[in-house]
Swiss-Prot record:
The gene is pcp. Coiled coil: none annotated. It comes from Pyrococcus horikoshii (strain ATCC 700860 / DSM 12428 / JCM 9974 / NBRC 100139 / OT-3). Its EC number is 3.4.19.3. It catalyses: Release of an N-terminal pyroglutamyl group from a polypeptide, the second amino acid generally not being Pro. Keywords: Cytoplasm, Hydrolase, Protease, Thiol protease. The active site is at residues 76, 139, 163. The keyword Protease applies. CDD domains: Peptidase_C15. Homotetramer. GO terms for molecular function: pyroglutamyl-peptidase activity. This is Pyrrolidone-carboxylate peptidase. Pfam families: Peptidase_C15 (PF01470). It is found in: Cytoplasm.
Length: 206
């Protein structure tokens, strides 16, 4: 079973993105995981993500993103076919009111077991919630493209997106901004992978 786990480069003036550390840690810890870091660029992220999906042909894909201001790990349920960039990407581009895929469905639902993932995280002491908006920036963009590839090409078999909060070192100069330890974020994403693996394995046995 092949699992593609993606994160993003830093953006929006931050000098780090914890998803890079999560991807690195779990790529080393879980043999089935292939880790990739996507650029915060609508043009380059599209090119890289679609190429990686074609090259790896994963059974499971979980895209990760940083959500400044969120208090919990957020397991996203839906991606919409809309780009409405609130800030420029790292190439200085700021597209608005554009579809991700011309003529594509208005939205896709995550196909990983989102509720089960959240419940398992909570059982392990990790603050987690279901989320119904992945935004209209690069995170939603990656989630939609992955699910569109799944729907049109058959791989990955299941996919979804997880947002993580800032880590404590990122909020030292940001008053009243929530954070979560990197270790807890890594543990949460590892749980998500294990739950997704189990769900896919069970479905293949039916």
């Amino acid at each position: 079973m092949k699992i593609l786990l993606t994160g993003f480069e830093p953006f929006g003036g931050d000098d780090k993105n914890p998803t890079m550390d999560i991807v690195e840690a779990l790529s080393e810890r879980i043999p089935e995981v292939v880790g990739e870091i996507l650029p915060v660029s609508f043009k380059r992220a599209r090119e890289k993500l679609l190429k990686v999906l074609d090259d790896v042909r994963p059974d499971i894909t979980i895209n990760l993103g940083l959500a400044p201001g969120r208090t919990h790990i957020s397991v996203e349920r839906v991606a919409v076919n809309m780009i409405d960039a609130r800030i420029p990407d790292n190439d200085g581009e700021q597209p608005k009111d554009e579809p991700i895929v011309e003529g594509g469905p208005a939205a896709y639902f995550a196909t990983i077991p989102t509720r089960e993932i959240v419940e398992e995280m909570k059982k392990n002491g990790i603050p987690a919630v279901l989320s119904y908006t992945a935004g209209t920036y690069l995170c939603n963009f990656a989630m939609y493209l992955t699910l569109h590839t799944s729907a049109t090409k058959g791989y990955p078999k299941i996919a979804g997106f997880i947002h993580v909060p800032y880590t404590p070192d990122q909020v030292l100069e940001k008053k009243n901004t929530p954070s979560m330890s990197l270790d807890l974020e890594i543990k949460g994403v590892e749980i998500a992978i294990r739950v997704a693996q189990s769900a896919l394995h069970s479905s293949q046995l039916r």
